[in-house]
Regions:
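Proline-centered linker/hinge motifs at extracellular inter-domain junctions
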Residues: 40-44, 96
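Non-catalytic extracellular/lumenal accessory regions of secreted precursors
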Residues: 493-574, 582-584, 600-607, 647-651
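C-terminal edge strands of extracellular/lumenal beta-sandwich accessory domains
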Residues: 29-31, 530-533, 563-566, 592-600, ...
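Short, ordered, surface-exposed loop/turn motifs in non-cytosolic proteins
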Residues: 149-183, 457, 586-589
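Short, acidic Ser/Thr/Gly-rich low-complexity loop/linker segments typical of extracellular
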Residues: 180-197
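Short pre-active-site segment immediately N-terminal to the catalytic Zn-binding motif
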Residues: 328-344
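Surface-exposed, flexible coil segments in extracellular/virion-facing regions
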Residues: 77-98
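Acidic, Ser/Thr
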Residues: 62-70, 81, 580-582
Length: 651
């Protein structure tokens, strides 16, 4: 199953993206004072000897001679003060590096180093100069084209990848380096264009090799748009995959040097060397996804993203924890994702939702026919709709190996699920709780092909405008209701056709609001009072509200596991919230409180039948509560799943 990694784990409760899909942690520190009146002598910084370098070479600054007369050096802080701006890697270490910029004439760069000792005293700044010389005169451009081998799917939808027929495609936007053939020092760096072409200048009569890096980089020394996206094996402390064809040639050569990256996989699907093209196939799908966003907003600043291909086997997911990254599978004997473009673009959709919109999706396993928590239904449905939009292909395919044959699962986001049960596949039918309804609606909003109930053809820009605008700030949870309400408000001329499209998915459109307040449809597999109302309204100082929690559709992230409550504070005040569960088998009731999409507080004590928190001086406004018993609403389930009542009061 495709799933997201939870972004916040409290008492065994997986709650993704409670604080914008992530969360910071702080620790209690300690302080000490010394007695005896000793005076701390400031440390002494040494930035090393002045250096000379050639454009394109990696330069290492050296602060290792810094010292503290009566203690130790605790930290280093390097800054550039003069010259063409460069990006320092490891600017808080003793030996940071940077790539000498391309210059036409000799240029001096100056760097400053300040060190701090173990008692907090800082040194006077020490400086060092690096003179960067232009490449030798008489140089000519080294040019070429980079391509990678993509393995296509077999024509039959139930068959998987056709390893016998790889296709060379341009490797777009990737870093290319000229390496000195002997020392392997980087002499020049550039990026390929949208056809895979590259060119750079190196010193005349130099033997070089060309290295391709699985990284797209446009850093803060360049105007918007910017990005830094890489594919590597693992997340912390590793470098991107690279490929070199091992060919050395003279920089004076008049012919282009093309690089064709092979799959490293035999026709039968077994490894036949280094699987070289995989990282570049992944990165090319990421490139295509970024172009979709740039077509809507040409000045987008993309946060750094790592794609981890190879280090884990726990499904595919996006997580903002630590370094934002997408995890993909790489097991040829079972499931590998480098050529599954819809899978990659789906996870990139979660990255987009997290960084530019809002992702209230709590994550967890999901599949066709599941009746999901409406936040999960929207997040996962958006992911596959976004993938189809990026690739302009409504047929999503996911390859795997069944032990004897290459296989694939597939579905068409263009095909509206049937509105009656059991549906095909079984249980797959129109619902606000269905990811298939969400992806069908969003695809039909985008595409320009008219079909049954679909006369909408808005393209991607209106979808993007809703995501970065009202969907980001909605006081409701992000669901199909909040999205469609905003889409209609921003596209008044298309309201009638949008209503027709949405109504075909068993969703009420008359007087629709962001909360789905007027919704009357629910799947027959879940009791009506466990699905509706979608939000129960609690009155401050009023009586308790009672809501069923059920596991009829499954546990963790399925419809009826968790219940939503709304309450409003008319003025700033202190408010106490109490929740309890009727579960007689080791109950564990928990709840989370939100305001305007932001996590406010929550109750996550060890298993207990009742939980209570107090919000001190809570500002006026509307609040949402996500309340559940861990027997039904946690991943993994804790206790005995079943049908219980949740009782909640707000005072």
């Amino acid at each position: 199953m495709r799933h997201l990694t939870p972004g916040l784990t409290l008492a065994g409760i997986a709650a993704l993206l409670l604080v914008a899909c992530g969360g910071g942690g702080g620790g209690l520190g300690s302080s000490s004072s010394s007695s005896g009146g000793a005076t701390n002598t400031p440390p002494i910084a040494s930035a090393g000897a002045n250096q000379t370098a050639t454009s394109g070479v990696i330069v290492t600054l050296n602060g290792t001679a810094s010292r503290d007369p009566d203690g130790t050096i605790a930290s280093f802080a390097w800054t550039q003060t003069v010259g063409t701006a460069v990006t320092l890697t490891g600017g808080t270490t003793s030996q940071p590096t940077f790539t000498a910029p391309l210059v036409a004439v000799a240029t001096t760069l100056t760097f400053s180093l300040v060190v701090t000792d173990n008692l907090g005293s800082t040194s006077p700044a020490a400086t060092v100069s690096v003179t960067v010389n232009a490449p030798a005169s008489g140089n000519g451009n080294v040019t070429g084209r980079v391509t990678f081998a993509r393995v296509p799917f077999s024509a039959s939808l139930n068959l998987g990848l056709n390893y016998a027929s790889p296709v060379q495609q341009p490797s777009r936007g990737v870093l290319v380096r000229a390496l000195d053939a002997g020392s392997q020092v980087v002499l020049a760096t550039t990026s390929t264009d949208n056809l895979g072409n590259y060119s750079f200048t190196v010193a005349a009569n130099t033997m070089i090799t060309v290295q391709v890096v699985a990284r797209m980089l446009r850093d803060n020394t360049q105007a918007l748009p910017r990005w830094d996206m890489r594919v590597q094996d693992g997340v912390p402390g590793v470098t991107p995959y690279t490929y070199t064809d091992g060919v050395s040639f003279n920089s004076n050569a008049a012919t282009a040097h093309d690089v064709a990256i092979p799959t490293g996989i035999a026709a039968n699907g077994t490894a036949a060397g280094v699987r070289a093209s995989g990282p570049f196939a992944i990165l090319d799908t990421v490139y295509q996804a970024t172009q979709t966003i740039l077509n809507a907003d040409a000045l987008t600043n993309f946060p750094a993203l790592i794609v981890d291909w190879g280090s884990q086997a726990d499904g595919t997911f996006f997580t903002p924890q630590g370094s934002q990254h997408i995890a993909l599978l790489a097991d040829l004997t079972e499931d590998t994702d480098e050529f599954d473009q819809h899978v990659i673009a789906h996870e990139f959709g979660h990255y987009i939702e997290f960084n530019y919109s809002r992702a209230d999706n709590i994550g967890g396993a999901h599949g066709l026919g599941d009746k999901l928590d409406p936040r999960v239904a929207f997040g996962e449905g958006f992911g596959y709709a976004f993938a189809a939009i990026v690739l302009n292909d409504p047929v999503a395919r996911d390859s795997f190996f069944d032990g004897t044959t290459q296989r694939s699962s597939s579905f068409n986001v263009e095909t509206n699920p049937p509105t009656s049960q059991p549906g095909n596949p079984i249980g797959n039918y129109g619902c606000w709780c269905s990811e298939s309804s969400v992806w069908s609606i969003l695809w039909d909003v985008y595409d320009n092909a008219a079909d049954t109930n679909d006369a909408v053809a808005l393209g991607f820009l209106p979808i993007w405008d809703v995501l970065i605008g009202p969907e980001r700030t909605t006081p409701a949870f992000t669901t199909i209701f909040s999205f469609i309400t905003a889409l209609k408000a921003q596209n008044a001329g298309a309201v009638a056709t949008i209503n027709t499209l949405v109504a075909a998915q068993n969703i009420d459109v008359t007087n629709m609001d962001a909360y789905g307040s007027t919704e009357t449809h629910f799947p027959s597999t879940v009791p009506s009072n466990a699905a509706l109302p979608i939000y129960t309204v609690a009155t401050v100082g009023g009586g308790a509200v009672v809501m069923p929690t059920v596991n009829d559709a499954g546990e963790s992230n399925k419809l009826g596991n968790r219940r939503f409550v709304r309450f409003t504070l008319g003025a700033t005040r202190t408010t106490t919230i109490t929740a309890s569960s009727s579960n007689p088998n080791t109950p564990d009731v928990d709840f989370l409180v939100f305001r305007n999409g932001a996590f406010v507080n929550g109750a996550f004590n060890p298993p207990a039948a009742s939980e209570q928190i107090t919000l001190t001086n809570a500002p006026a406004g509307e609040y949402l509560i996500d309340v559940y018993d861990c027997a039904n609403g946690c991943d993994p389930s804790e206790g005995t799943p079943g049908d219980y009542n949740l009782t909640l009061t707000v005072n």
